[in-house]
Amino acid sequence: MGFLFSINRKLKMPRDGNEGMFTIPGFSQIQFEGFCRFIDQGLMEEFHKFPKIEDTDQEIEFQLFVERYQLVEPLIKERDAVYESLTYSSELYVPAGLIWKTGRDMQEQTIFIGNIPLMNSLGTFIVNGIYRIVINQILQSPGIYYRSELDHNGISVYTSTIISDWGGRSELEIDRKSRIWARVSRKQKISILVLSSAMGSNLREILDNVCYPEIFLSFLNDREKKKIGSKENAILEFYQQFACVGGDPVFSESLCKELQKKFFQQRCELGRIGRRNMNRRLNLDIPQSNTFLLPRDVLAAADHLIGMKFGMGTLDDMNHLKNKRIRSVADLLQDQFGLALVRLENAVRGTICGAIRHKLILTPQNLVSSTSLTTTYESFFGLHPLSQVLDRTNPLTQIVHGRKLSYLGPGGLTGRTASFRIRDIHPSHYGRICPIDTSEGINVGLIGSLAIHARIGHWGSIESPFYEVYQRSKETKMVFLSPSRDEYYTVATGNSLALNRGGIQEEQIVPARYRQEFLTIAWEQIHLRSIFPFQYFSIGASLIPFIEHNDANRALMSSNMQRQAVPLSRSEKCIVGTGLERQAALDSGVSAIAECEGKIIHTDTHKIVLSGHGDTISIPLVMYQRSNKNTCMHQNPQVRRGKCIKKGQILADGAATVGGELALGKNVLVAYMPWEGYNFEDAVLISERLVYEDIYTSFHIRKYEIQTHVTSQGPERITHEIPHLEAHLLRNLDRNGIVALGSWVETGDILVGKLTPQTANESSYAPEDRLLRAILGIQVSTAKETCLKLPIGGRGRVIDVRWIQKKGGSSYNPETIRVYISQKREIKVGDKVAGRHGNKGIISKILSRQDMPYLQDGTPVDMVFNPLGVPSRMNVGQIFECSLGLAGDLLDRHYRIAPFDERYEQEASRKLVFSELYEASKQTANPWVFEPEYPGKSRIFDGRTGDPFEQPVLIGKSYILKLIHQVDDKIHGRSSGHYALVTQQPLRGRAKQGGQRVGEMEVWALEGFGVAHILQEMLTYKSDHIRARQEVLGTTIIGGTIPTPEDAPESFRLLVRELRSLALELNHFLVSEKNFQINRKEA
């Protein structure tokens, strides 16, 4: 076996001095371990299932020698795969043999099976040039589960559910007469004796293998004896109940095959994990290799159910993590590989039969096609719900995406059927799944995130590390605890790090977790303790300082909004952080890291050349690369020529990183006060300094592409000679018809000139064309202009043009031209900004700096937030961050604060902030920084009048992010445009140049104001009255009064037609005043 992929990376960070070092796993390590497990174990497991294939006459045999398979190093690099829209994959070769049994000859060849996409250094895949990631899925673990429900009489009914590896379910239930039934469908149930007999047991074996044989004998009447008299009778009875067929079916081989396929294969295959769970729950010793449900399992389950009926045993909590399993990238890729081998087997069988029929020469090479494996993986990465396009908005988004856990997907739940209990936080999530980080909306609680120290174990369970507590000893030992072992230990949850120098807990009573309950017990009864304050949070939640002072809902919003932050043109480290910023930036892979020590011999914007150990290494840098959210990924060199560096040192900072630390936003001076209503309801007032000094300026790169095809009339042409177009639209095209690099383009400009040939008949020519043809004999062009034009809102600078030409040039392999345009966006009214505590808002006004409120030293404030957004939202952490940020800015310090610091001392956060403010006040000789009458607040002045405000105002430095929800992407207007064909009303949506909907409530509002003419215009001229809107356009150009529409609009006509389809005729009439005659008007 050849394997050319290995990643095993861990980072060390210091912990307490008395316990040396501990290891924080790489944030992408779960993806790496899963893929390595697939390559090392999954491939061989599926290969061993591949059978020897024989022809119908059993003269020829085909087999694979799977022990000698080879994975070849990829032929292209990651960058080239993205650039050329290819898949970063490895070719799989396997020796295969073709044996002629008559002559005992064998022909062996190494054949190409197909391509397997490889995981790159970011833990992602590159498929057709697009970064994709496979997220982990949480499923109900196969095994047996016991529960009780109340029937309509209020009596408890006990049932056991057997879940197979395929997700199929079978139930055993016990009724009031202590009879045990197996429910094979929603309506049908059969006796446990019939099920056991159909699985191969006779009555004597059944009675010998149960603990309560008298209960089984109690409902054994003559009819039941006849049903289980033989295995055939039991199978017939079982089939009759399962398939719901009437009459008397006859036992046959096809009947057994159908039952095997529809029931036993889907509901009785437990798998490796199911067999382990079944043995543990029922105290069995069946070998792990026996993965099918046996009669012994069913009888043991029935015994346990009887014990439940009489009060023995415990019920199962279906939402406990010990009853869940993680379906990782290894399992998903292995399933697809097995599916591809099944398709390959069918293809080989068909090829052998066809070749023998047509008397063709057979070789292993021409029997096997690579399409089975390649197309299986392409469809998996393109269509499977758990294979998603990697979100690359910023570095944090990339690493968080790979650590998601989803209850959704094949075999899982759906957002509309999942109950509240499944979505809720469970005590077993502690240290494994973050209780905060989840999606908002319909999928809340169904998509979670792994805690930072959690790992996925061999059996698909989530494990979390803890330290064993040894009384009166310094010795520590770290253990990874699976959810099934939680019940046996008492875990300290509070003061896990508050140890004295001897390693002994100073406090006697500590909060702890035992058997899914949170208690307060003596330290002597503690078995395990946490290893890190962030242990139970995800990465996003771990980056929120003072998170313990925030409401959980706001912390959830913050962890989601940090993933929406746009990388800024000039990033800045946060003054107040948590200490995980460096780890997050490092694991995201956006920074360039030195792989060995050496000396820098050359550096520029394109590459860094490093000399070390006698070799010269060239490290290419990312230059203005577009992410799939149109943000700009760029690397800036941080080392100079001649500098000696060490292994692991930062060579170049990436997008949203500074000095190797994550830097998503900016430290700006904020004030919490109302200002003329401009910060009403979460609106934000900002200073013009943020615009003019490019504080919140970001670059966005958009991609526009066009393809050339070979049509039935001939090939399409790329050219700069486009007839009937104005010259200024073509001014940026080069001689090839493609926009020149560095050009500034505006809306409507031609980016790529393209002509499509079309059929030419005499009637299609314009009169002047026919005249030119008749007089001068000039051949008029019959090509149609199909140029790539810059859409609305796309103005910017052309930074890259790519012309991808694939071999063949047919319509199936079209040429693709991509144009990349960079936009510089300053912050403006309508953009969304947010802090790290769920405090979000929209820019409402940009005020000149002289009008902004200013401090006592004359510094104008940068942002003004509404103070009413704090008490009701209960996110007080922003107040601590704001005040401590001010102290850090004045003292030139950066703070990295672990959460839950109240574990050491009461009011620890408040004391820290006030002490730093007091020190800043003393060192800078500014008494207004800390005023004892109102600590943290200060008297500030109105910039318009120079007068102080009535009340002291909270001011400070907060870390504020600019989010990707920007007004340039959302603002939209329409005068006229496209209309729907059926209703003749304007289309909906910005992409279709649609209009704004005037719905039922909008009509009520207009009616309430009595604006009859505006209401009539909304429902006629501006909507679906075809003739009236045409007349409006004419009278607007010519002048004059707009005529009043007399007939009905198109939507009313549509209603009439729909009523006619229901055989209802609707007409309206006019009654004459003179003779009261009815004049009929057709609708």
UniProtKB/Swiss-Prot annotation:
Entry-linked NCBIfam families: PRK00405.1 (NF001616)
Gene: rpoB
Cellular component aspect of the GO annotation: chloroplast; DNA-directed RNA polymerase complex; mitochondrion
Organism: Acorus calamus var. americanus (American sweet flag)
Record carries keyword Calcium: no
UniProt name for this protein: DNA-directed RNA polymerase subunit beta
Principal location class: plastid
Catalytic activity, EC: 2.7.7.6
Subunit-structure text: In plastids the minimal PEP RNA polymerase catalytic core is composed of four subunits: alpha, beta, beta', and beta''. When a (nuclear-encoded) sigma factor is associated with the core the holoenzyme is formed, which can initiate transcription.
Role this protein plays: DNA-dependent RNA polymerase catalyzes the transcription of DNA into RNA using the four ribonucleoside triphosphates as substrates.
Class of enzymatic activity (EC top level): transferase
One annotated GO molecular function: ribonucleoside binding
Entry keywords, A to Z: Chloroplast, DNA-directed RNA polymerase, Nucleotidyltransferase, Plastid, Transcription, Transferase
Gene3D superfamilies xrefs: 2.40.50.100, 2.40.50.150, 3.90.1100.10, DNA-directed RNA polymerase, beta subunit, external 1 domain (2.30.150.10), DNA-directed RNA polymerase, subunit 2, domain 6 (2.40.270.10), RNA polymerase alpha subunit dimerisation domain (3.90.1800.10), RNA polymerase Rpb2, domain 2 (3.90.1110.10)
Similarity comment: Belongs to the RNA polymerase beta chain family.
Subcellular location: Plastid, Chloroplast
SUPFAM superfamilies referenced in this protein's UniProt entry, alphabetically: beta and beta-prime subunits of DNA dependent RNA-polymerase
PANTHER family associated with the record: DNA-DIRECTED RNA POLYMERASE I SUBUNIT 2
Gene Ontology BP term (one): DNA-templated transcription
Catalytic function, reaction form: RNA(n) + a ribonucleoside 5'-triphosphate = RNA(n+1) + diphosphate
InterPro entries from the UniProt entry: DNA-dir_RNA_pol_bsu_ext_1_sf, DNA-dir_RNA_pol_su2, DNA-dir_RNAP_su2_dom, DNA-dir_RNAP_su2_hyb_sf, RNA_pol_bsu_bac, RNA_pol_bsu_CS, RNA_pol_bsu_protrusion, RNA_pol_Rpb2_2
